[in-house]
């Protein structure tokens, strides 16, 4: 199942909700959201800096991943960016492929 890194930032009412509910209840809500689309959360970490929360999760396909991100972003409580993750085997396979390419000016 494809793995993704979700970069989450709380905004406005989302920050107030986090302060009211705490992190554990937000984890339960996130687990439910992922599961409702056939996915699961591998790990979830709060942070401080440019990103409030990092979630590594498995999703069955890109459409489900986009549906999750759209729904979360539409809530207005947070913003979400997704990054597809690759395994070492994926990188090995990619490194064996050689596309035809000419650099600009060459």
Question: Which residue ranges define each predicted feature?
Answer:
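A compositional/biophysical signature of low hydrophobicity enriched in polar/charged and small residues
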Residues: 1-106
């Amino acid at each position: 199942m494809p793995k993704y890194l979700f970069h989450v930032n709380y905004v406005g009412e989302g920050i107030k909700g986090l302060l009211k509910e705490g992190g554990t209840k937000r984890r339960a809500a996130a687990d439910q959201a992922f599961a409702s689309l056939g996915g699961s959360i591998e790990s979830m970490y709060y942070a401080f800096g440019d990103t409030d929360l990092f979630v590594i999760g498995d999703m069955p396909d890109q459409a489900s991943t986009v549906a999750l991100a759209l729904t979360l972003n539409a809530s207005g409580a947070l913003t979400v960016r997704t990054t597809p993750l690759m395994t070492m085997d994926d990188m090995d396979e990619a490194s064996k492929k050689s596309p035809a390419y000419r650099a600009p000016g060459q």
